[in-house]
Amino acid sequence: MKSDKKRNRLSIYFYGYSLVSIFTFMLTVSGCAGKGKEQEKIYQETGMFEWAEEAVREPEEALHLAEELEITRWYQETDGTTEAESTREFVKVLHNNNIEVYALLGAVEWGYEENGATLLAHLEKIVQYNMQSSEKERFDGVMLDIEPYISDYWKENPEEYMDRYISCMKKGYKFAQKNHLRTAICIPRHYDDQGLTAGLEELIKETCDEVAVMNYSCGNEIEAIKTEAVLSEKYGKELHCILEFQEIGKHGLTEKETYRNKGIDNAKETWEELQKEYENINVIRDYHWSSPVREMLEEKDAD
């Protein structure tokens, strides 16, 4: 009789202990999941455009800038063949410092070719470079800066040239996917303003992994990038907000299009506001580009 009571007490004890353990485990898992979501939301990535091909000769200069601005992605202009050995060392150094490196390439006229011939030829060079390099020396992806919309042809017939551009980019993206290259595309903030929203959606859905919007609309960035943000979230694409830092007058830039006189801190505040507005996606914060940004930092240090 006593042994039965003892067994019952033990059963109740282990049953209660099991319930407590399960409850504790569920709380722990729930807490971890919550922390994971919170960390995911606040995770910040920052990119830098580099248009000087010779920059690959001085990886320490890139590292210095990257450390100062907490850069996690570097978009380096290259054709995949020039200064290949310097490029390999450059990419390796940045990778060793947890910075992803994308090959930056593109030209206006590439976007006129429906068959994507020129784009494919340049992507092939990047693929060959990667095949001939060690894992640490390989590009993580490509940043395609192809801007056919600035041509007179486009202005005369935007629908036709948008179709050509989309055809070109689809072929490039298919090739990049086949060869394990992440693809980011630079686009202006105004395709929807031109009545080309359907084409914009097709671009985002079918031609890239990442959408890098040249959001040169100081003070109106949140509204200007709204369509792209909605479509990026819809199709699971990463969204970049590129801000301009070149001086007023360069390439016709106005005070309303560049942060040159507003300062880097002001730009950071803009990125923060964008992230708060579009909280369901991580907005990658891109500086355009290294040369004017360095000048601004030097001017700030001199004050």
Region locations from a protein language model:
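Substrate-binding cleft of secreted/luminal carbohydrate-active enzymes
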Residues: 218, 238-303
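Active-site groove signature of glycoside hydrolases
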Residues: 126-161, 282-286
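Boundary/entry segment of secreted carbohydrate-active catalytic domains
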Residues: 36-65, 69-71, 77, 184-190, ...
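Aromatic-lined carbohydrate-recognition surfaces of secreted/lumenal glycan-active proteins
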Residues: 102-107, 166-196, 239-247
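Short, acidic/polar
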Residues: 52-67, 117-132, 193-204, 224-225, ...
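Glycoside hydrolase catalytic-domain groove-lining segments
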Residues: 170, 181, 213-252
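C-terminal motif of bacterial Sec signal peptides marking the signal peptidase cleavage site
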Residues: 29-31
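Aromatic- and acid-rich polysaccharide-binding/catalytic face
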Residues: 71, 76, 197-224
